[in-house]
């Protein structure tokens, strides 16, 4: 039998243990009604080195005083922010959501973020005056006026998805008519396109806003985690990571927001631009279990950036890059490409620093750029001025995208420019330009070609059907492409290398299903092509591509086809494999792709 005193002591100890257990589960619980109040309390918790913060469930609503984002969190380390049941509602569409800078091992969990006022607009096209190059658009109730110049997208009123077979609509001036009706003057090249694309009185239109900011940003961060977060009505990207050591983890949903106040129609889009965007990270991101839909641009782009070579001799290079953006450090690998995007050489950086002379190229803005010098570990071949310099070590190498759903959006499901990546078990459906493209983009200054990719067990369905890519002059001939950024000028080394495309399903895709260009050591094995070429398609025909072929290979070496099959092909499939110029060692061209006989 326990004495009363001992019993009280035991109960007291148990209470301490329970309290301690609670403290370990949530060191601090904070309440807030506005973003300003929440920001102050989170920074105070970080200053006090609190490891776990629980935000009390509820709606935190308002703008941001003296900053561009509702929350700006800098320098946090080893901190968990549990926001389950919390809604962060922005009232100013020009403000971003959560911005984390220079953070290490920070977890944000359970938050719902959205803009109450959409950072875009939408309505119905009433008519088109071809002589005046002017659309007349009635903006839906509850949505803002269109910006003075931007880009719009046509939507099918029945499916409320991007209208098939049309171009984006670029415009440069807006006139207020009456009520919610506006005149929108389109660019000079648009009237001829709209003659065939537009159905006045029926077509819906969504128009990008230009004043918004990122929903969630990880800037120069490392080892951070975004878990069970939902984003709606994003101002630019849903999630952005920029620079830093990287290795961040993402599990989130980007989807359509609620109807704004006074509206009678649901939003047509979920974000103004990309669902996710990674640029300049040393270690690539991991995206797992994400649902990304309704965005106006790519779902998952991963890249670094180029520098411009101004002079080269022996082991020394001079190059120009943006101010405060010299990404090349000793020990990093570098790759060089000629002005026509052909691979020239690779090496390792020994030393780098500011150039001892200022080249001052007259066509480049001196106030935004800095000239640097670099010494490599080996002699380089002749490198022409205007060549591009990149490193795979700041392009998100080692990225993983697994078990994600990407659907019903403009542009590309994946836009990959990184090495050592894994893309597996994803569903990509309704991407208007392509399900996946691996390519550098010299015009956007985004690097580079990819090496050592594995793309397996994914489903690509109903992609490459709008945004101009169905036209004969399309610059994207394939619904799935590993390619150069421009038509190749001939072999001078291969950009893409060692890529495995295994066990994927390509379903309901018209035109060329797969395009391989500027590639070496590629394996295409065990893929299924279901119901291809059911409808006529001229995608890329005017540029010399054959959209009647299932797969097109050009400028390639050591490409292997094995155990790929075509099921229920449509009447417009005329050729399984077309082999273009500058190819060698193509294995399985005869029996590596076969049409499966119906039982």
Regions found by a protein language model. Give the residues of each.
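Acidic Gly/Asp/Thr-rich repetitive segments characteristic of extracellular carbohydrate-active
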Residues: 26-54
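Right-handed parallel beta-helix/beta-spiral solenoid domain characteristic of secreted/periplasmic
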Residues: 27-36, 60-63, 77-101, 107-121, ...
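Extracellular beta-strand-rich solenoid/capping regions of secreted or surface-exposed proteins
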Residues: 39-46, 61-80, 89-109, 117-133, ...
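The right-handed parallel beta-helix/beta-solenoid scaffold, focusing on the short coil/turn
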Residues: 51, 69, 77-79, 86, ...
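Short glycine/acidic-rich loop motifs that flank beta-strands on beta-rich extracellular proteins
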Residues: 64-67, 91-97, 117-121, 213-215, ...
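Ser/Thr/Gly-rich low-complexity blocks that favor extended beta-strand/coil architectures
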Residues: 115-116, 124-128, 138-179, 323-362
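Small/polar beta-strand repeat architecture
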Residues: 168-212, 354-399, 407
């Amino acid at each position: 039998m326990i004495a009363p005193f001992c019993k009280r002591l035991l109960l007291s100890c148990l209470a301490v243990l329970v309290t301690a257990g609670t403290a370990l589960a949530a060191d601090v619980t904070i309440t807030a009604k506005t973003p300003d109040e929440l920001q102050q309390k989170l920074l105070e918790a970080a200053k006090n080195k609190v490891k776990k913060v629980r935000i009390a469930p509820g709606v935190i609503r308002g703008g941001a005083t003296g900053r561009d984002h509702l929350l700006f969190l800098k320098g946090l380390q080893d901190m968990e922010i549990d926001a389950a049941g919390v809604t962060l509602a922005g009232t100013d569409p020009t403000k971003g959501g959560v911005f984390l800078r220079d953070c290490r091992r920070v977890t944000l969990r359970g938050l719902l973020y959205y803009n109450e006022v959409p950072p875009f607009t939408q309505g119905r096209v009433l008519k088109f005056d071809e002589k005046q190059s002017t659309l007349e658009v009635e903006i839906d109730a509850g949505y803002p006026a269109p910006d003075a110049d931007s880009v719009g997208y046509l939507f099918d009123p029945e499916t409320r998805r991007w209208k098939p077979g049309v171009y984006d609509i670029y415009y440069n001036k807006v006139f207020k008519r009456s009520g919610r009706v506006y005149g929108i003057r389109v660019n000079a090249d648009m009237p001829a396109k709209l003659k065939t694309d537009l159905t006045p009185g029926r077509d819906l239109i969504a128009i990008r806003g230009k004043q918004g900011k990122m929903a969630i940003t990880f800037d120069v961060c490392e080892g951070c985690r975004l878990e069970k977060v939902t984003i709606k009505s994003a101002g630019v990207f849903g999630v952005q990571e920029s620079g830093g050591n990287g290795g961040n983890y993402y599990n989130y949903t980007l989807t359509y927001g609620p109807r704004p106040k006074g509206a009678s129609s649901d939003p047509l889009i979920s974000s103004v631009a990309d669902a996710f965007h990674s640029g300049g990270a040393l270690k690539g991101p991991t995206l797992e279990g994400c649902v990304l839909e309704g965005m106006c641009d790519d779902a998952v782009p991963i890249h670094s950036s180029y520098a411009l070579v101004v002079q080269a001799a022996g082991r020394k290079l001079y190059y120009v890059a943006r101010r405060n953006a010299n990404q090349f450090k000793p020990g990093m690998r570098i790759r060089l490409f000629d002005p026509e995007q052909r691979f020239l050489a690779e090496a390792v950086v020994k030393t780098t620093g500011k150039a001892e002379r200022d080249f001052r190229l007259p066509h480049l803005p001196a106030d935004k750029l800095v000239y640097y010098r670099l010494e490599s570990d080996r002699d380089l071949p002749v490198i022409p001025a205007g060549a591009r310099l990149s490193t795979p070590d700041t392009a998100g190498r080692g990225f993983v995208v697994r078990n994600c759903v990407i659907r019903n959006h403009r542009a590309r499901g994946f836009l990959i420019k990184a090495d050592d990546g894994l893309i597996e078990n994803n569903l990509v459906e309704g991407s208007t330009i392509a399900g996946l493209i691996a390519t550098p983009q010299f015009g956007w200054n985004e690097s580079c070609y990819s090496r050592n990719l594995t793309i397996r067990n994914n489903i690509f369905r109903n992609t490459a059907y709008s945004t101009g890519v169905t036209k004969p002059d399309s610059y994207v001939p394939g619904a799935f492409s590993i390619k150069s950024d421009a038509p190749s000028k001939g072999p001078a080394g291969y950009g893409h290398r060692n890529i495995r495309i295994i066990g994927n399903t390509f379903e309901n895709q018209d035109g060329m299903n797969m395009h391989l260009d500027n590639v070496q050591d590629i394996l295409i094995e065990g893929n299924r092509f279901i119901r291809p070429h059911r409808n006529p398609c001229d995608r890329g025909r005017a540029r010399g591509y054959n959209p009647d072929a299932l797969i097109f290979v050009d400028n390639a070496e050591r490409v292997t086809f094995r155990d790929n099959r075509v099921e229920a092909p449509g009447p417009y499939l005329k050729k399984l494999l077309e082999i273009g110029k500058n190819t060698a060692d193509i294995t399985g061209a005869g029996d590596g792709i076969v049409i499966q006989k119906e039982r």
